A protein has these predicted regions:
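Protein kinase-like catalytic core scaffold
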Residues: 161, 223-224, 270, 282-284
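A short beta-strand motif that forms the metal-chelation/ATP-contact edge
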Residues: 215-217, 280-294
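A long amphipathic alpha-helix within ATP-dependent nucleotide-binding catalytic cores
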Residues: 234-283, 305-320
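Anionic group-transfer/hydrolysis microenvironments
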Residues: 12, 88, 166, 204-205, ...
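ATP-binding N-terminal substructure of ATP-dependent carboxylate-amine bond-forming enzymes
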Residues: 1-111
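Active-site nucleotide/adenylate-binding loops and adjacent lid/helix of ATP-dependent enzymes
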Residues: 6-25, 30-32, 37, 77-78, ...
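Short, flexible active-site recognition loops that position polar ligands and cofactors
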Residues: 292-302
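Phosphate-binding site of ATP-dependent enzymes
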Residues: 175-265
Length: 321
């Protein structure tokens, strides 16, 4: 098998407030903080390929009347056979990921591509696509004004409810509300800070009891899965917020649902969060930039290596066109 040049598009420091630490998860390894970009590079080398790192802060997009190109440190970029972007921000999404589209315009295969990432980063757009394709999601209503709140709560089944920003990640900007008084107080603060003014009100799936299931999808397969349970006193099961996790075997229905949801969004790689409701599994979240450390540690499966194997396969197929 020939050696490939596999690119890693590193968004670290694009948003210093978020990139200010590649932090270790609770219960993670001692020593250096886990760096997913470094882990991908190590996986590329271990599989016999050459890593090519592009730090976004050093890239310049160039246009003329003939082609689109990328300069790196003001010099023409030597291309790669396939590119794997790693993002670490949730604001200014469309603008920041334009660099991914630029690589696509240079005929470089990208995993994941620009448009699917933009869809997945927007919870509202994700809900629209999943609903159109009849993929089950929690009851959700989108509002902008206080006067619609009471009816909105009734439509999703009453308290408790979940309120979300359209763009939060890792459980941030997600709040459980148990009363009308709490809802009005919380939204007064959230709307003052919100850039979009849009809030998602979602049913609380009580039978999930603070647990969800993360499926790590690569291509058409779930390569790893874990059950996450919220920390005491919280309802969010994200490992980054102190939740606990154990490896799990998903049901055939859940695996099929995760793969199908990934496919309809157009993603190659996705972290799919599933709730087990009384009516069957529902998709809670879709993450186009899923964390690598937690699920690898919990399951013992090297998901970074799985990603690179898939990227190499895409590159080989592309070279034969």
């Amino acid at each position: 098998m020939q050696e490939l040049r596999i690119g890693v598009l590193d968004f670290t420091n694009v948003n210093p407030a978020i990139s200010a630490g590649v932090q270790r998860l609770p219960g993670g390894r001692a020593g250096k903080p886990y760096n997913p970009n470094r882990r991908l590079q190590d996986a590329i080398k271990a599989l016999g390929h050459k890593p090519v790192v592009y730090k976004v802060e050093k890239c310049q997009m160039f246009f003329d009347n003939r082609k689109a190109a990328i300069l790196y440190n003001n010099k023409k970029v030597k291309g790669c056979d396939v590119l794997v972007p790693r993002l670490d921000f949730c604001q200014g999404i469309d603008l920041e990921i334009s660099i991914i589209k630029q690589f696509q315009l240079m005929s470089i295969p990208v995993i994941n591509k620009y448009l699917p990432i933009a869809r997945a980063k927007n919870k509202l757009r994700t809900l629209q696509i999943l609903t159109k394709m009849r993929i089950p999601v929690p009851k959700t209503i989108v509002i902008r004004r206080f006067e619609y709140l009471d009816d909105a709560v009734k439509k999703v089944g009453g308290y408790p409810i979940i309120i979300k920003s359209p763009f939060g990640t890792e459980g941030r900007e997600v709040v459980i509300i148990e009363s009308r008084r709490s809802l009005y107080s919380a939204l007064d603060i959230i709307w003052r800070q919100s850039q979009s003014g849009i809030i998602l009100i979602q049913e609380y799936v009580s039978e999930a009891t603070g647990s969800d299931y993360r499926a790590f999808v690569v291509g058409d397969h779930v390569v790893a899965a874990m059950k996450r349970t919220a920390a005491v006193g919280d309802f969010r099961s994200n490992l980054s917020l102190g939740g606990d996790a154990v490896p799990v075997k998903l049901t055939a229905e859940e695996e099929s649902l995760a793969v199908r949801a990934t496919r309809v969004l157009g993603l190659d790689i996705c972290g799919v969060d599933i709730l087990r409701g009384n009516g069957g599994p529902v998709i809670m979240e879709m993450n186009a930039n899923p964390g690598l450390e937690g699920i690898s540690r919990v399951t013992g499966i090297d998901v970074a290596a799985e990603m690179i194997r898939y990227a190499a396969l895409v590159a080989y197929k592309n070279s034969k066109k």
